[in-house]
């Protein structure tokens, strides 16, 4: 079943074939990127028009988003975009450190030449976008965050754990929602951190790569907390 309204989102480049999946991805995208602000009441009638989906599809989608933590469901009041808080952000960042650093160590130790090639390509795309951001061109902020996501995913893709990759994706998207709320660029500091992680990973120094990654996430957390 196809839907003419289905469009690729930042974190999901290709349109999906089912209405339910595409509706889930599009609403999640709009929550992450602030089109649906924290605390917004999600009224089914309005969503039906916005996303060209049936009420039954929307209920299923909102329940799935609630199980992933992007939507809150309150008895008698319906669905809301999950509110944000500094404590929640700190918890998400700490969980991301635990999971992503472990996955990175596994990936560095297991990765083959295809993994190396994918990592080089992902870092190249991110590096070019960071140069654009540094020059003052901020017209492609969503593309910048896509390349950031693709780089972090490329780092850990060889961890050989589908479950770990799925859990990491949810944490990364939750963390990204906070970043998009403040949407400030850390500049050379973040770019250098990415290069340090990249260099350590290619050198197959799993412990150094994990340390650099933890520093990177921690610095990003402090930056985002200060901007909230």
PLM features: residue spans?
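Short linear motifs at protein or domain termini
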Residues: 1-109, 225-228
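Helix-capping and short linker residues that terminate individual alpha-solenoid repeat units
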Residues: 202, 221-222
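Short helix-capping and inter-helix turn/linker motifs at the boundaries of alpha-helical repeat units
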Residues: 18, 142, 187-188
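Short helix-capping/hinge motifs at transmembrane helix termini and TM-loop junctions
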Residues: 108-109, 160, 184
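Conserved amphipathic alpha-helical segments that form helical-bundle/coiled-coil interaction surfaces
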Residues: 113-180, 191-199, 208-218
